[in-house]
Amino acid sequence: MFEQEDEWISKTQMKKQMNGLQDLGMELTKLSNDTLKKIGLDEDLYEAVVTYKKITSNGALKRQAQFIGRLMRDTDPAPIEAFLAKLRGDDAAHNAFLQRVEQARVRLLADDGALTQFMSDFPHADAGKLRTLIRNTKKEQEQNKPPKNFRALFQELKTVMESQGGTGEA
């Protein structure tokens, strides 16, 4: 016990860590049961979260939240945090990919020759469908209509770029 003096944590620091784990557990209670199964939680933690969702009494909710926090202490929070970050869209790689898709859409709408370049980068893309979406998007913008085709173009580009390299890295 005396060898671990350099790793000593104050009681306040420990409480902050425990509250952080309890907050992470509370984020889990907001997810659907199917999503919870995808995370791969311990069976006890999964059952505690599902039970929390069924409870209606405020006192019991508080006790169950503390129990979830207690179970979180025995669980590695890193995979859970990573999964939740990905769900929230905080994943930096995913954000960078979405920015590349947006840049491709802007280029395609601004320059008629950009489609040829895009097709050489992504030969499996459906040129006819992209050409139609680009034309309809330009018409939409001229007539100040809701951006239905603008969004459809983004989704099509995203699908094409994802199928090339998982995250769209060409």
Curated annotation (Swiss-Prot):
Keyword match rRNA-binding: yes
GO molecular-function terms, A-Z: ribosome binding; rRNA binding
Gene3D superfamilies: PSPTO4464-like domains
GO cellular component: cytoplasm
Keyword vocabulary terms for this entry: Cytoplasm, Ribosome biogenesis, RNA-binding, rRNA-binding
SUPFAM superfamilies referenced in this protein's UniProt entry, alphabetically: PSPTO4464-like (SSF158710)
Location, primary (coarse class): cytoplasm
Signal sequence bounds: none
Record localization: Cytoplasm
Family: Belongs to the DarP family.
Record-given protein name: Dual-action ribosomal maturation protein DarP
Taxonomic placement: Bacteria, Pseudomonadati, Pseudomonadota, Betaproteobacteria, Neisseriales
